[in-house]
Amino acid sequence: GPPIPGEVQNPIHLDRVCVRFPELKLCMIHGADPWWDIAIRLLIKYANLRIMTSAWSPKRLPESLLHYMRTRGKTKVIFASDWPVLRQSLVVPEALALELPPDVLDNYLFNNAESFFFGQETD
């Protein structure tokens, strides 16, 4: 991460923001390491919060996040490569190999980003 104290990157700091501004769309970018479980709890708690896996190779995503994606978080996780950090030719095949249900994979790779950035709700 950047040369700043790690505690300022803890997603718990979004808790108060999500409460005060429920109409504001918020997205945690670059994953949430080492606070994945806190991030998932916040994603469950707030309808206006998403997480983007930019700069994370899909094969390195924690099982807790993959489980969340398959269950309660089908619309909450957004794929991104953070190119040129990770190349599309590497991360797209890794994402396809995650053994996600087809609807969850479609949401992860496209639908969730479309909905978040452009307001297009998808099934």
Q: In which residue ranges do the predicted regions lie?
A:
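Short amphipathic alpha-helical interaction segments
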Residues: 56-60, 69, 83-87, 97-100
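Conserved, mostly hydrophobic/aromatic
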Residues: 30, 51, 82, 105, ...
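Mid-to-C-terminal alpha-helical segments outside catalytic/metal-binding sites
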Residues: 73-76, 86-123
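Acidic-enriched, low-complexity/disordered segments with a strong bias for Aspartate over Glutamate
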Residues: 15, 33, 37, 82, ...
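Catalytic pocket-lining loop regions of alpha/beta-barrel enzymes
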Residues: 1-78
